[in-house]
Design a protein with these regions (language model features):
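FIC/Doc superfamily catalytic core
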Residues: 1-132
């Protein structure tokens, strides 16, 4: 059973830094943070609430927010798309969601977000097609 948005396990800056470090170690690239404030903002945005209620409808929308804000804020020197993708997958799995296996749809989604072709709502709609 998936948790409610209010009871989701959220990612921290430290977790996202570990995801980023793992992606750089595995696939190469330059380590380092380009802008710490943009990283903190990208990690905080999916945790937004108003009057104790999440501003997001469900876990998939929150995962899409991690993907969207980490891609668009571009907080790292290198590996922003990989870190955003990894954060999205980790969040989904930690919150009992089942992302479908790797396929070109994932790469297309991440590249479209990074290029500015999708807004957050469009990102959520596309992500829903990739999660069981």
């Amino acid at each position: 059973m998936r948790p409610t948005p209010e009871s989701c396990f959220h990612l921290t800056v430290e977790i996202v830094l570990e995801i980023h470090a793992g992606a750089i170690a595995r696939f190469g690239g330059s380590p380092g943070i380009r802008d710490r404030a943009l990283l903190e903002s990208a990690v905080a945005a999916p945790q937004a609430s108003w009057r104790g209620k999440s501003t997001y409808a469900d876990s998939v929308e929150i995962a899409a927010a991690y993907l969207f804000f980490l891609c668009r804020n571009h907080p790292f020197v290198d590996g922003n798309k990989r870190a955003a993708f990894g954060a999205c997958l980790v969040f989904l799995r930690l919150n009992h969601c089942s992302p479908r296996p790797d396929g070109p749809e994932w790469e297309d989604l991440v590249l479209a977000v990074a290029a500015g072709h999708l807004d957050r709502e469009q990102t959520t709609r596309r992500l829903r097609t990739l999660v069981d």
